[in-house]
Amino acid sequence: MKVLKSLKSAKARHPDCQIVRRRGRLYVICKSNPRFKAVQK
């Protein structure tokens, strides 16, 4: 899980990536390719 300053680049990497907001943080979750998981504080 990477910590990124901005998630625009993370979302563009894979078509299955979704940006989810939980507890004031933005998460990228990717079911088909889990190595793209990221969090933005």
Swiss-Prot record:
GO terms classed as biological process: translation
Keyword line: Ribonucleoprotein, Ribosomal protein
Pfam hit, one: Ribosomal_L36
InterPro entries recorded: Ribosomal_bL36, Ribosomal_bL36_sp, Ribosomal_L36_bact
Tagged with keyword NAD: no
GO cellular component: a single term: ribosome
An annotated Gene Ontology molecular function: structural constituent of ribosome
Family, as annotated: Belongs to the bacterial ribosomal protein bL36 family.
Classification via HAMAP family: Ribosomal_bL36 (MF_00251)
Name used for this protein in its record: Large ribosomal subunit protein bL36
Natural source organism: Vibrio vulnificus (strain YJ016)
